[in-house]
């Protein structure tokens, strides 16, 4: 049963081949038996899941349901879930019980989707390896000596190990697409503003976006149908009709113009990864797409600009965790300043502290113009590069990550080396564009991701391009060795 995709689960539930309760119990049993190996979940909501599954079965019996009714998924532990711990993988929020649901959680609840639990992640979504979690690192099901990517590593590992058929995730600089690449999954980050951020604990508010990790593009389309919505509670959410993302999945790719940026194939890209991406380009040519060389000349500035803007926003957002209102509070503070200092020192991990310090420095008097203001100007130039490119092409294609999954500890002592893992994904966030990663082969028995970037609100086109690639290949059907 755990081999089924979301689309197959939907069909089976409609045909009464199995019940939501049976599927949910099956996944809960697998999590209990296998997740000690992967550490993909922080909280398993067994009782809640079975209650939701029973309610979904009643709705299914009545026949008046949404497409996803009865399907179980996992939620990244960055999304607030009423009555359930929402920790952001931090000691700071270890005991925080959210009083309300994030909008996307509420959307899925209304659709009858079952919550299996909350998945592990890098602390406050800051990381590319899922090594910064207060609850311990997550292991990649393809090779347990290697990282699953981050920050949505728990969501990726859970889906790759078949401990959930799909999971919600978030992406600030690549945190959906990079784990998708390293774990052999489909991961989509929608256009900024397409999906509500209300109830998603903020890292960098102008970059954060909720999205999906699944096995196939078809599954991602089904899940995005219910995830995307206009939400007046999120002032950055755009009031725009949500299309049926499954409607054009089978549309032929004849006439699709795919741009390949020369800047994505330079120094630092694993040659074997490059070869697989080039092979994927040939697949697209065989499907009727035309390939065009494009230039994104400010690509080399994306990482430095991001690591000024994101820490600056994180410094502001995380200032709310002060030991007064909620979150970790130190014992016996001498005065208010001691309360602030010790609560934050004890509650935040090393990487979070590093980014807060960098961000505070960039925003400080005398440095704002030299760093933050300049980074925002670079951001505008990066966005303009994409705008110019999309005058000539429909989709931009390249590698998702410069190399396959790396071993634990191999980059932890060099923050810059870790930051460069997101070199191909960050620009998409800076521009606010939709991005998607799909598997395109294996290097040294580890998955490699192919990234597709679309114009604003072109999620349907990206999903169509991804689905057609998956109809022509079987990379998305490959399972990590040893998975039961």
Curated annotation (Swiss-Prot):
Keywords: ATP-binding, Ligase, Nucleotide-binding, Protein biosynthesis. It is an enzyme of class 6 (ligase). One of its GO terms (biological process) is translation. One of its GO terms (cellular component) is glutamyl-tRNA(Gln) amidotransferase complex. It catalyses: L-glutamyl-tRNA(Gln) + L-glutamine + ATP + H2O = L-glutaminyl-tRNA(Gln) + L-glutamate + ADP + phosphate + H(+). InterPro entries: Amidase, Amidase_CS, Amidase_dom, AS_sf, GatA. Its EC number is 6.3.5.7. The active site is at residues 76, 151, 175. One of its GO terms (molecular function) is ATP binding. Gene3D superfamilies: Amidase signature (AS) domain (3.90.1300.10). Signal peptide: none annotated. Pfam families: Amidase (PF01425). Allows the formation of correctly charged Gln-tRNA(Gln) through the transamidation of misacylated Glu-tRNA(Gln) in organisms which lack glutaminyl-tRNA synthetase. The reaction takes place in the presence of glutamine and ATP through an activated gamma-phospho-Glu-tRNA(Gln). Heterotrimer of A, B and C subunits. Belongs to the amidase family. GatA subfamily. HAMAP family: GatA. This is Glutamyl-tRNA(Gln) amidotransferase subunit A. It comes from Cellvibrio japonicus (strain Ueda107). The gene is gatA.
């Amino acid at each position: 049963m755990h081999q089924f995709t979301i689309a197959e689960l939907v069909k089976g539930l409609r045909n009464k081949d199995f019940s939501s309760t049976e599927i949910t119990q099956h996944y809960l049993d697998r999590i209990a038996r296998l997740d000690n190996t992967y550490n993909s979940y922080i909280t398993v909501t067994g009782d809640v899941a079975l209650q939701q599954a029973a309610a979904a079965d009643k709705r299914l019996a009545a026949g008046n349901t949404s497409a996803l009714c009865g399907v179980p998924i996992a939620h990244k532990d960055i999304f607030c879930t009423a009555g359930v711990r929402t920790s952001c993988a931090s000691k700071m929020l270890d005991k925080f019980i959210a009083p309300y649901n994030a909008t996307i959680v509420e959307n899925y609840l209304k659709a009858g989707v079952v919550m299996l639990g909350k998945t592990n992640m890098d602390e406050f979504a800051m990381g590319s390896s899922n090594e910064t979690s207060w609850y311990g690192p997550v292991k990649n099901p393809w090779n347990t000596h290697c990282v699953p990517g981050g920050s949505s590593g728990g969501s990726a590992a859970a889906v790759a190990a078949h401990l959930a058929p799909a999971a919600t995730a978030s992406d600030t600089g690549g945190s959906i697409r990079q784990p998708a690449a390293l774990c052999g999954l489909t991961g989509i980050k929608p256009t900024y503003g397409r999906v509500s951020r209300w109830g998603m604990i903020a890292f960098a508010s102008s970059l954060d976006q909720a999205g999906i990790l699944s096995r196939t593009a078809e599954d991602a389309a089904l899940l995005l149908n219910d995830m995307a919505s206009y939400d007046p509670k999120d002032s950055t959410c755009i009031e725009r009709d949500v299309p049926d993302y499954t409607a054009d999945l089978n549309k032929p790719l004849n006439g699709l113009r795919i741009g390949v940026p020369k800047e994505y194939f330079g120094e630092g890209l694993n040659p074997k990864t490059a070869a697989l991406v080039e092979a994927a380009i040939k697949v697209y040519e065989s499907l009727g797409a035309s390939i065009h060389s494009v230039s994104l000349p400010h690509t080399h500035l994306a990482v430095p600009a991001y690591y000024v803007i994101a820490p600056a926003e994180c410094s502001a957002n995380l200032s709310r965790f002060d030991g007064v209102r909620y979150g970790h509070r130190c014992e016996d503070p001498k005065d208010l300043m001691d309360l602030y200092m010790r609560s934050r020192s004890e509650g935040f991990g090393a990487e979070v502290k590093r980014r807060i310090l960098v961000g505070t420095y960039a925003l400080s008097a005398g440095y704002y113009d030299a760093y933050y203001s300049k980074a925002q100007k670079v951001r505008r130039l990066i966005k303009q590069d994409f705008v110019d490119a999309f005058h000539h092409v429909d989709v931009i294609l390249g590698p998702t990550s410069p190399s396959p999954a790396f071993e634990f500890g191999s980059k932890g002592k060099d923050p810059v080396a870790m930051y460069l893992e997101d070199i191909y994904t960050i620009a998409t966030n800076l521009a606010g564009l939709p991005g998607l990663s799909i598997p395109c082969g294996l290097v040294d028995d580890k998955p490699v991701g192919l990234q597709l970037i679309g114009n604003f609100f072109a999620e349907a086109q990206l999903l169509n391009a991804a689905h057609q690639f998956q109809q022509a290949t079987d990379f998305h059907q490959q399972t990590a060795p040893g998975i039961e």
